């Protein structure tokens, strides 16, 4: 069931939706990010009006679902990604984990007509192995060729992502590997470096998505670093949004950084 119109209006008016989404499909031409353009190497933003409208509606539904406790932060993040990422885009999963986000990204960019790219990074070999195994079972051979996996720290993403491929999305899941060693976690120092790298490679009209898990020792310290970085971005070129459950102190926090 779609959210009631008054709920969507309330969310927009209070800044709960990123600026690019504060427009109904019937309110005229889409903003620059959503307007169909000619394809560039590594970036393809052509989409039908129906796809654009569906993307916006999907995000609004996900936001209302998150606010009412019916959707997880990961679902909200994926809904926002789908409204921004287009077939043929280049995207980066900076923390592969078990491959769920890598898989979601691949489905967003894969197209037989254009060559999308997914760069997956994780410092743990077990995470890369898990992601690789999952993808081999879940996608076809053509889609699998679009994924490049690297056992490397997320702070070194610029070493593996080609400079001539504009990046539409860089996504982080910060914390520990689900089902893995909980003592091996992302840490504030390298995460800050990774955010700096992501802000350099992401293209105009692109997004940095950061889901911070804070229920483990060190989680809140890392959240502080992410929030400090997001708050320091220049307002003329960046929009920073935060989604947080205030009465659930251990719930993950989603931070979205949109580059104008």
UniProtKB/Swiss-Prot annotation:
What is the E.C. number? Answer: 2.1.1.61
Where does it primarily localize? plastid
The processes (GO biological process) annotated in the record are: methylation; tRNA processing
So what does this thing catalyse? 5-aminomethyl-2-thiouridine(34) in tRNA + S-adenosyl-L-methionine = 5-methylaminomethyl-2-thiouridine(34) in tRNA + S-adenosyl-L-homocysteine + H(+)
* Organelle transit peptide: 1-46
In Gene Ontology terms, what is one molecular function of this protein?
A: methyltransferase activity
Residues given in the record as S-adenosyl-L-methionine binding sites: 98, 100, 122, 124, 154
Q: Which Pfam families match?
A: rRNA_methylase
Q: Where is this region: Disordered?
A: 20-41
Has the keyword Amino-acid biosynthesis been applied to this entry? no
Swiss-Prot/TrEMBL keywords: Chloroplast, Methyltransferase, Plastid, S-adenosyl-L-methionine, Transferase, Transit peptide, tRNA processing
Q: Pathway, per UniProt? A: tRNA modification
Q: Where in the cell is it found?
A: Plastid, Chloroplast
What is one GO cellular-component annotation here?
chloroplast
Q: What's this protein's family per the entry?
A: Belongs to the methyltransferase superfamily. MnmM family.
Matching entries from PANTHER family are given as: S-ADENOSYL-L-METHIONINE-DEPENDENT METHYLTRANSFERASES SUPERFAMILY PROTEIN (PTHR35276), TRNA (MNM(5)S(2)U34)-METHYLTRANSFERASE, CHLOROPLASTIC (PTHR35276:SF1)
Q: What does this protein do?
A: Involved in the biosynthesis of 5-methylaminomethyl-2-thiouridine (mnm(5)s(2)U) at the wobble position (U34) in tRNA. Catalyzes the transfer of a methyl group from S-adenosyl-L-methionine to nm(5)s(2)U34 to form mnm(5)s(2)U34.
This protein is called tRNA (mnm(5)s(2)U34)-methyltransferase, chloroplastic
Tell me the organism. Oryza sativa subsp. japonica
């Amino acid at each position: 069931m779609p959210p009631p119109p008054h709920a969507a209006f309330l969310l927009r008016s209070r800044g709960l939706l990123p600026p690019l989404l504060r427009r109904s499909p019937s309110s005229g031409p889409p903003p620059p990010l959503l307007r169909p353009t000619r394809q560039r190497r590594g970036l393809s933003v052509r989409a039908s009006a129906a796809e654009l409208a569906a993307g916006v509606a999907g995000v609004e539904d996900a936001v209302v679902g998150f606010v009412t406790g019916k959707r997880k932060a990961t679902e909200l993040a994926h809904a926002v990604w789908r409204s921004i990422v287009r077939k043929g885009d280049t995207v980066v999963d900076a923390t592969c984990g078990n491959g769920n986000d890598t898989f979601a990204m691949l489905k967003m960019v894969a197209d037989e007509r254009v060559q999308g790219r997914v760069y997956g990074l994780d410092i743990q070999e077990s995470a890369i192995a898990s992601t690789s195994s999952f993808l081999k079972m879940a996608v076809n051979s053509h889609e699998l060729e679009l994924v490049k996996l690297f056992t490397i720290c997320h702070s070194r993403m610029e070493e593996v992502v080609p400079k001539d491929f504009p990046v539409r999305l860089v996504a982080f899941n910060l914390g520990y590997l689900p089902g893995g060693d909980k003592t091996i976690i992302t840490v504030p120092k390298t995460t800050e470096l990774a955010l700096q790298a992501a802000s350099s490679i992401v293209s105009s009209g692109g997004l940095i998505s950061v889901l911070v898990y804070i229920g483990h020792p060190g989680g809140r310290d890392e959240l502080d670093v992410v929030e400090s970085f997001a708050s320091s971005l220049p307002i003329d070129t960046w929009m920073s949004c935060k989604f947080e459950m205030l009465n659930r102190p251990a719930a993950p926090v989603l931070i979205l950084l949109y580059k104008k």
